[in-house]
Curated annotation (Swiss-Prot):
Keywords, in A-Z order: Antibiotic resistance, Ribonucleoprotein, Ribosomal protein, RNA-binding, rRNA-binding
Protein species of origin: Escherichia coli (strain K12)
Family from the record: Belongs to the universal ribosomal protein uL22 family.
InterPro entries in alphabetical order: Ribosomal_uL22 (IPR001063), Ribosomal_uL22_bac/chlpt-type (IPR005727), Ribosomal_uL22_bac/org-type (IPR047867), Ribosomal_uL22_CS (IPR018260), Ribosomal_uL22_sf (IPR036394)
Function: This protein binds specifically to 23S rRNA; its binding is stimulated by other ribosomal proteins, e.g. uL4, bL17, and bL20. It is important during the early stages of 50S assembly. It makes multiple contacts with different domains of the 23S rRNA in the assembled 50S subunit and ribosome.
Protein name: Large ribosomal subunit protein uL22
Additional notes on this entry: The wild-type allele (erythromycin sensitive) is dominant over the resistant allele, and is also dominant over the temperature-sensitive allele at both low and high temperatures.
Lineage: Bacteria, Pseudomonadati, Pseudomonadota, Gammaproteobacteria, Enterobacterales
């Protein structure tokens, strides 16, 4: 049974989160959690929370056995960007894009 968990508007760019997502795609859930625990990136914390949520959803909603679960799909889409202004010299200003992302994790017992 496939179970989904999402984190929308995560405050990290999709490019940075995809680096972490690629590490756990296709792995068993226990192995994926170990990898994320020892990955020294902010995105790893975000992905780990979503993965733990997907595991809890599978256990609670579908009655799945945690030992059989695998990360079948994980993908990261771009979310909306917040536009900010940084003042520069001689009256100019630069636009700063504070990027967000949508993290989706799908776990399955097959």
């Amino acid at each position: 049974m496939e179970t989904i968990a999402k984190h929308r508007h995560a405050r990290s760019s999709a490019q940075k989160v995809r680096l972490v997502a690629d590490l756990i795609r296709g792995k068993k859930v226990s192995q994926a959690l170990d990898i994320l625990t020892y990955t020294n990136k902010k995105a790893a914390v975000l992905v780990k929370k979503v993965l733990e949520s997907a595991i809890a959803n599978a256990e609670h909603n579908d009655g799945a056995d945690i030992d059989d679960l695998k990360v079948t799909k994980i993908f990261v889409d771009e979310g909306p960007s917040m536009k900010r202004i940084m003042p520069r010299a001689k009256g100019r200003a630069d636009r700063i894009l504070k990027r967000t992302s949508h993290i989706t994790v799908v776990v399955s017992d097959r």
